[in-house]
Amino acid sequence: MKLLALTFLALAALASARNINLEDVIDLEMITAYDYHNKIGIPLAEKIRKAEEEAELSSSRIVGGSSASLGQFPYQAGLIIEAPAGTGVCGGSLLNSRRVLTAAHCWHDGISQGRSMTVVLGSIRIFSGGIRMVTSNVAVHANWNALFITNDIAMITLPSAVSTSSNVGFIALPSGNELNNDFAGFTATASGFGRTRDGGAVSDTLNHVNLPVITNAVCRNTFITIQSSNVCTSGANARSTCQGDSGGPLVVTSNGRRILIGVTSFGHRDGCQRGFPAAFARVTSFISWINQRL
């Protein structure tokens, strides 16, 4: 209760300093991450499951977005989270044989916490195929704040080591000069098992989209509490991450290799095709935290 009171005091101070309504700050930051399991993860999981089952009986393709081929994103993890109210879905990134990076709100969304999760690797479908491991070993960032949606990062430890193959591989972390790069102007690739468009559409398979990385100053025009520890992508041309992609990777090519620069955190409550930016946890801001847990 004391922590909640302090959080609201901090929100009030921020609102006063920027001459905006407190309700506006809270409303912006409680968009797609706060209470994620009940609002998004659990309802979406059942729709994805049904889409996969129907795909087994039909040759229909995905409407909107681009489907991934098996092995195209070998570092992509699918997460099936068992929460108190039901089963939800998220994404993650395989860093080494026993560590998967995801968003904190995929495990604890400010209202409910997961009990266990199935980590799915080497599959373009989340409810079937691939390597599947059950774990509850999740380290959430100690300063994760579900109201501000800050420090939205968590590390999953797998119960046993996974072997690499053509379909399973690790994503590199930024290093050297890349640690000082904000990546604005880069074209990044986001991938996930979430919705392919607003209005209830889901896919039966992994999807991906290329997105321009924008400056935090531009992003802050939409999300006023964007921090330096966030990285954002443009939502122009109705292209963005969407509900269910939470925790998944944002990747760029640098020095001839793919590196992880973001963990999918939140988008705008009004939808994924309205031109609003998407926000991610900036990997370079958490590189020490990540390396300590590898």
Describe each PLM feature range.
Residues K2-L294:
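Extracellular "complement/coagulation-type" protease architecture
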